[in-house]
Structures are given as C-alpha cells and as structure tokens.
Amino acid sequence: MAVSMASQFFSQEEGTSEVVSTSERVVELLNMAALATNDTKITMLKQVQELIINKDPTLLDNFLDEIIAFQADKSVEVRKIVVNFIEEACKLDNELLIKLIANLHMLLKDENVNVVKKSILTMTQLYKVALQWVARSRPPSEQQESCWDLVTEMAADILLLLESDNDGMRTHAVKFVESLIVTLSPRTADSEVPKRQDGDISLEQIPPDHQFLKYNTLRDLGKQAVKELLKFMAHPAISSINLTAALGSLASIARQRPMFMAEVIQAYETLHANLPPTLAKSQVSSVRKNLKLQLLSVLRHPSSYEYQGPISTLLLDLGTSQGEITRHLPPPRDSNRKRAREDGEGGQKKSRTDIPLPDDDDDKDTMQLPTIPAPAPSTQSATDITADFVRPLLSPENVANLVLISMVYLPDSMPASFQSTYTPVESAGTDSQIRHLARLMATQMSAAGIGPGVEQSKDIPVDVVEEENIKPEGLVIKRRISALTKGQAISVLGCQSEKTKEEEEEEDDAPLAKKRPEPILPATQIRPSGVGGRKKVFRLKEVTEPLTDVQIKSLKLGAVRRILQAERSVGSSGASQMRVKVLARLVTQLDISVKAEVLSHFLNDPRMRLDLALAWLYQEYCEYQSGAGEEGYQECLIGILTGLQERPDQRDGVFTKVVLEAPLLTDSALDVLRKYCEDEGRSYLGMSTLRDLILTRPARQFQYLHLLLDLSSHEKDKIRQQSLHFIKRMYEKESLRPYIEKFALNYLQLLVHPNPPSVLFGADKDTEVAAPWTEDTVKQCLYLYLALLPQNHKLIHELASVYTEATADIKRTVLRVIETPIRGMGMNSPELLLLVENCPKGAETLVTRCLHILTDKVPPSPELVKRVRELYHKRLPDVRFLIPVLNGLDKKEVIQALPKLIKLNPIVVKEVFNRLLGTQHGEVSSSLSPLTPGDLLVALHNIDSSKCDMKSVIKATNLCFSARSVYTSEVLAVVLQQLMDTTPLPMLLMRTVIQALGMYPRLGGFIMNILTRLIYKQVWKYPKVWEGFIKCCQRTKPQSFSVLLQLPPPQLLSVLQTSPDLRDPLLAHVRAFTPHQLAHVPHSIMAILEAESRTDAGAEEAAQVEEEQETPAQDIIARRLAQEKSLKKQIEEQKGRNNQEMEEVAEVDPPAIFIAEEEEEESLKSQGKEEPQEDSSSNATTAEKSPVADEPMEEEPVEKKD
C-alpha cells in the first residue's frame, strides 16, 4: 500500500520523539544497572532488552556494546541475561552474528554451569539461524565464512560436553545434538514437522553451489552426530536423567527424519537388552516406562511400517497389550497417501535437482543431491550377523537344554529388581519372538565382544577400514584455535588431497586471508591484537650476560618472597589457587633456603595457609613417586609437623589435618606424632588423630595402632588414661580386637620374667635389665590388660596363669590393682564363676581377693555361693574361701565353719565378724546375715574345745562385745538367757556375764537373777563356771549378798575361803536383819559367817554337822516365809524412799529363798524332811520355769539404809 510523502513525514516526526524518549530511558536504565545490586540490575537489564528488542529495534546498534559489557559481571543471572540478549538480537538482525558469536563462544566457556547451559540452549537456536543466514547470502562474505567456522567449532565443543561431569550440561547437549541432526539431514515427505519448527532450515535447502557450505560435509556431520548420540546412550554408566533425554531425542529424530529409524530401533533393542547396571530399581521402572512411550510414538509414524515387527516385540516385552499396540498402528490409507505424496514429491525434486552442478574450485568432486534412503541399512552390522547366526540355533531342544543348564546358577528366590521389571512373554515360540530373542542375544554378545559378527568385523581388510576412516576426517571441519589467544586463524575446509611441500611453503609465506570474529570486550580490557607480518626473532642470549650463583640464588629467593607477599592482592583477584600451584612447583625445584622461607610463611598463619602446605607436600610426594629420593618429602613433612608442634597454640586442628591429608607417613613423622601425643595439653587431639589414621588407612593401621598401644603404659597418668580411653573404643571393632588382645597379653606375660624387660624403659629390644620389679613397672604391664578385662571376661584366666608363676611382690601389686576391673565384671560373669570353680593351684589368694571385691558391698549371688561351696567341699577345703560368701551360706554351715574361722589372723577374724554382723562399712545391717548377733555369740560359747582353743574363742567373744552398737543390753539379755538354757553350761558363761555387766551396769538385777538360777543348776559342779560365779559375786556386792545366802553351807564356805574379803560385809549384812529376819537364817550359815576366829577345819566340821542334822520341813518353811515377808517389806520401803528407775531387762525369777504359799502348802502335805541340797535343786527348777521379771533386782535393805 503506497503512503504519501506527507504522511511519511509526519509519522517520522512522531517516531523521532518516541525514539528519543526510549533512548533516554535505555541510557538511564543502563547507568542505573551499572551501579545497582544483583536483583535490581537483573530487572533493569530485562527492561532494557524489552525496550530495544521489542519496542525500538533501531537502538540495537547504539547500545549493543554497553549491554554486552555486562557479560563480565560476577552475577550468574546477569550473564544469563546477556546470553538471552545475544540470542534475541541475532534472531532480530542476523548480521549481528558477526559481532556477537565470539562473545557467545566466551560465555560457552564460562566457569558457571548455569551460564554454560543457557549458552547451549542459545546455540540450539542460533545454529539454525546462522546456517540459514549463510545459505541465503549470495555471495557470502569472508566475515560470514569466519563466523560459520566459529559456529561449527562451538557445535563441536557442545558435542564434547556429552562427556561432561554435570548431568544438566549433558542433558542440554543431548537436546542440541537432536537439533543438529534434524538440521543437518534432509526433510522427506514422511517427516514430522513441529509447528514451532516449520520455518527451520534443513539440509535439502542448502544451495548446491554454495561457496563453503558443502552438502556432503554437512550430511556427514549429521551422521557423526547420530553416532555420538547412540554411543552416549549406550554408555553403561549413563544416568537416569540423561537416558530419558536421549530416548526422547532419538524418538523425535526418528519421527522427523525417518531415514534414521533403523538406527533408533536398533538402539532401543540394545538398551532393552542391556540396561545400565547403575540404575536403581525405581529408575529401571521409569526408564522402561519411558521406552514404552517412545516406542509407541515411533510406531504411530507412517514410516514405521517396515519395523512394526521388532517394535511390537519390544512393546510386548515391556508389558504392552496387543490391543494397545494395534491402536497405535498408523492407518493404512494415511500410509498409502503419504507414499503417493512421497513419490510425487520425489519425482518433482528429482526433476528439479538433477541439473549438473558447476565444478567447485575447492572440491573437485561432483555433488549428488540427497535421495530418500532405504529403510534398512545397506550393510549388515555385527549385531545383524550374529543374530542371523543365532536364530537357526534356537530350536526347542537347544532352548530347553540352555534353560536346564542355567537353572543351576539361578538364585533360590527371584531378585526384587528382576521381579519388578519382568513381564510374561505372550508370543513365546512364534517366529517373531524367536527373531527378537536372537537379536537380544546378538546384542549382548556383540557388547561382550564375541560372536561371528564381531569376528567378521575384525577380518575387514585394512585398506577398506582406512578408506572409511579417512573420508569422514577429511570432511569434518577441523577445530580452530581460540581467537582470544591466537588472534587470527584460517578456516580449513574438507579436502582429501594431500598438499605438496611447495604448497605448504606457499601457504606459510602467504598472509592470513581471513580474520576470525573477535568478541566485544569491555572498555577496561585490552583487546588482543591480530598477528601482523613477520617480525625479527628476539634472541635472549644476545642481550644478556650470565649471572653468578649468588645472584641466581638471590633472584630466586626474591621472586618467591614476592609471590608470598602478594597473598592478599592475588586473593582479591581470584587467583589464589594458581598462586598456590606455582609456589608448590617452585619450592620443590629450588634449594633449602627457599623451602625454609615457604615453611616460615606457612607457620605464620597455618590455618589460612594450609592449602599451600598440602599442595607443597603433595608436590614433593609426586617427585618422590617419579623416582626422586624420599629426602625432599621427608624434610617437607617433618618440617611442617615439627613447626606445628612447636607452636604454643594449636586448637584449630591444623596438625591433625596435615597428618590425615599426608599421602605417606614416614617413621620420623610417626615419632613427631608420638611426641605430640605425649604432650599433656595436646594428648587428646594427638590421639584423636591416631584414631582417625587407624580407621581411615587400613594398609598401615596396625602400625598406628601399635603406637597408640605403646602409650597405654606411659609413665604420665593423663597420657595413659587418654590412650586407654581410645583403645577401649578401638577394642569394640572386630578387626582390631585380636591385635589389641595380643599386645595386652604380651605385656602381661612379662610379669613372669625375673626382671623387668627393657621395653618398659623405652628400649627397642625386649631384653631384661638388672633393675628389680617395682610396683610402677608391674602396673605398666597391667594397665592395658586391666582396661580390657571388663570388656572381655575370658582374659581373667590369663591373669590367673601368670599369677601362679609371679613373685610375691608382683602378686601383692596384682591384688591391689584388680579391684576396679573385677568390680566391673560383676559376680554374674560366667568366666569369673568358671575361675572360681576351677581355681588353679597357686591362685587361691587371687580368687579369694576377687571374691572379697565382689561381695564387699553387695550380697553374694546364689550362683557364686554355689561355686564357692563346691570348691570348698570338693577341691580346696580352705575356710578363707567361705569368708566372702558367709552371708550366702546356711546358718548351719556358718556355725560349722566358726571354729576354723576364729583361728585365722585377727584381722581376718574381724572381717568375718563384720560380714556376719553387717558392720563392715560402719553401718549396722545384719538383715542379710544367716546368723543374728545373738546366734553368733551363743555359737561361740558352744564351740567344742577340742576343735578350737579357748584363747581364740575368748578373742572372738571380745570382738562381739566391741560391736557395742550391735550387742545392746537387750541382745545380751537374750544371749544370757539362751546360755542359761544350755546343758552343760558353757565354760565362758560367767566371763560373758561379767562383760555384759561391765558394759551395761543397769543389767545388775538381771544378773542377780542369773546367779540365782545358776545356784539352782548347781553351778559348783562346773569348776570354771563356779570360779566365774565367785568373781561375779565379788564384783556385784552388796547386791550379790542375797544370792550368797542362798548357797548351801559347803558352797558358801568355799566362796568365803576363795574370797575372804566377802565374809565381813556379808556378816554385817546379815546382822543388819531384824530379829524376825534373822530368825530365818539357818544356823549353819550363821556358823560359817561367825566362824572367823575358828580354824577352817572346825568351821568345816560344823558345816558338815549342820548339813547332816535333819531339820523338820515345817521349820524350814516357816523360817523362809518369814524371810520372804521381811525382805518384801524392805523392798517396798526402798522403792518408796528412793523411787529408783525401772530397768528394761528380762524378767528375773525371785530368789530361791522366796517360796510361794501354794508350794509351801504342797510341801507340807507331801514331804516330811528334805535335805538342803534337794531344796536348792527344786527351787532351781521352779526358777527356770518362771518368766523373766520386768524390773531389776533391788539392792539389799542394809545397803539402802546406809
């Protein structure tokens, strides 16, 4: 539509104002973006792109350099925006490719993965744009040719990224390769063309007479890309993400370029037969599902008609139903229509393109236009040959034999991975299934390098292989050297003819014809200049003089110092790693002074310069491995470790990091590590390092473990305890346990030597020295063993074995130090119980000590008591074994063992009584003892004198009385009561009575009752007891006077003869009686008391006469009744006057002279006359049956009056 000049003029005026405002806005945004932060900068640059690309493209040339300058920005997102701007700008104006393709090449080499991925996506679009632009240029310029060379080089770089370490980069590279293959292959009638790619260029659109775009070269590039993609998908370690992307790309290629459908189907078959072993179970399921979807999409394509058999078989193996396969088959009519259209278009194309092409100066071959390839490849592959070989062999008999043979190697249960992917074969035995099985087997055989197909491929003549290999190499455009480093380069096109020497010389002399595209660089950078003409070669030797050794050394040292001092400036520029590498390489090649300078530099700040030390150390190790001596590495390692050890503050673990990162630890380095561990302030860090070495370096772990074990016998307690702590944790590991046990037992066995070996004093050899064993040296041999004992109870038997052969001094030390480990084992340890049961000869004291330790604070277990009892009764009848388990024995067993126990050492006897009385820890708790305190004291009195001497029994009773908190007055009262009931009377009865009275004087009344009962038991018949009776009467006078008056005359006379000092007080006591009371005192008693002036013989005769004289029973009873009434009256008066406090003792019987009235009446009726002795015995019987009085016996009235 024509526009008038006036309307054009006015529209230009309106546009000018708009451009000015847009331009100012762009300038403003660019200035603000240069100073803004990342987020704001990104927003502004997006606005700039919107204004320039979409609103006013005329501003593109004006602000191109300013926008491209942001490609050096530190922000990744900013650089990605620059990549996107390059794409949009080049699509808008293809001529900008000449300016911007070099910048895109730089961004393709960016250090950030995301920028590289964005650049690959941009290249996916710009490759087609560049090819279309170059193909339509008639004639193309040299700049376009150079630009296309760089685009081709970038495509080759992206192909190499298929081997990248980054999953995302590989995925983006797969997508680029897919686009590259579609672009560099002809579009046919059956090709699917996505709507968004409808206008894209393809190979058939390349002009046949183009100056440098060669049809065959581009076609071979596309085929080579197909091979690279297939090779990538067949890699055994391909990831699930990459495999999914490759499957989709191959399916897309097969639909858009049916000529490659055969290769795609074969690749799918190979993948189905050889899934990568690195995939997880869930990934395998995902890949199989994706493979099924891609096969269905390929099956829907009209060109899949020739491949429906293998595709259907694969789908059936993947679990697809036959109905679903049928639904995805292309309609026959569509297929026929497309074939007709293909034939028509093919004829037209043939008529249009079958024009002879003019000769090209660069390539003398005649170009042939593309024809639609046959569906199957013209030559058979190794897989096809092997499949043809295997297929006839798959007869039912052979298959059955193979199944039977393979069943031997099958697992008992179906593996989960196989079960999850297995699908039943629906068409088993059919011809298609046999062909499919043959191809699967052939694929696996070819991958393994076996089969006739592989053999035939090896037998191909060498000239054919060379010819096939030479052709693509000549056609592939060679890689260029980067323009940033070389300036200019000549584009080399495919050519098979070799150049002569003359032609090469001419090319060398010729100036460079084409200039490679250069990137737009920021103003602050210096643009590299191109190579000019020839220059005179500069020879350094012509202008320099040799330096002296001193100068050389000084220059070297100065250079290294400058590098060291430039640490901060180099770090700010981001070249720290390069600086470290340079220093590491330099220092290994220079002399000691330089090494000392670098070491000093490191030690000034070890934490920040650790990377330098490790780089230097590894460089020295590389030199050592390459054949140099070990001295350099040794000096470097020792220098670093020693320097770190000498530093006062080492809390950041640099020493540990160096030790753990060092590639090799020499013996000298281990010596430094040992000294580090022996420093009390660093012992934990040093031993932690040793532990990490043991766990992370299995090749020499026992050497490091030996060092840690050596420290377990260190003389410093802190070092030793720290070492034992780590060893016990190492002991939990099964692989280290035998070595640790062996070391501990070796040290334990040293105790059998007559003298301590020198190994205990730090010497290298195990030789004995003249020094005797001391407690410290004995403990050195035991520390590790005792630390392991609670963790491995079986080691206790080794201690018993060594103990039997050791000297007395060693045994004493062993007994002192085993308390903690034995307590840690516990009395329920099976090994400890076994030791008790099988106590070795000579280890009795060790076993006894163990028993004492185990039962010191807790009662013995029934199992322990059982083992000790069996040991005592069957093998070793040593009563000392029973002491620790006394509280677990029966009462009868303890009483039987008492005679032997009290004959032991006094200290041991005291321990026995402490256990029985429950007072071993200063607390009274006899609830667990089989004997009560009273039972124990009674048992001691009843010990047979033939089994134990009386002296030991007396000492034992004294121990009981020393436990005053146990033997209270109540307990003693019960004991005395039990002893009184014993027949015959115990020999030590009166001694106990006297001791009880001495401990508790308030028992006086109860004692009087005891004495009275003893008269009834005719105590004078027991000489020892009678002697004690007299002594007790002496000590308890005047309370005992009433008891003495109850004695028969002969026994009273014996008492007065034994203790004459009792006569006068007793006589005075009697004379103080009232006449009524005195009338009841027998004349014989008075005669004995008043016979002081007579001779002893006369007194005896009078006593005998009085005894023989028969007195009527009535007179005796009357006198005693009177005495009873008189005494009772006196007692009541005494209670009223003194109000004496009642004593809490056992009830006592009344004196024998007090007879109840009922007994008096019975005696009057039944008896005539009785002898005094018989009367005493009858009263004694009565007293025994009477209960113990609650009140103590009162003192005599005469004493109270006084």
Curated annotation (Swiss-Prot):
Bias type Polar residues, positions: 1175-1184
Cysteines engaged in disulfide bonds, as pairs: none
Lineage top rank: taxon: Eukaryota
InterPro entries, alphabetized: ARM-like, ARM-type_fold, Symplekin/Pta1, Symplekin/Pta1_N, Symplekin_C
Keywords: Cytoplasm, mRNA processing, Nucleus, Repeat
Annotated segments matching region Disordered: 323-382, 496-532, 1096-1115, 1130-1202
The keyword Cytoplasm appears for this protein: yes
UniProt subunit comment: Identification in a complex with cpsf2, cpsf73, cpsf160 and sympk. Interacts with cpeb1, cpsf2 and papd4.
Similarity comment: family membership: Belongs to the Symplekin family.
Entry comment, domain topic: The HEAT repeats have been determined based on 3D-structure analysis of the D.melanogaster ortholog and are not detected by sequence-based prediction programs.
Protein name: Symplekin
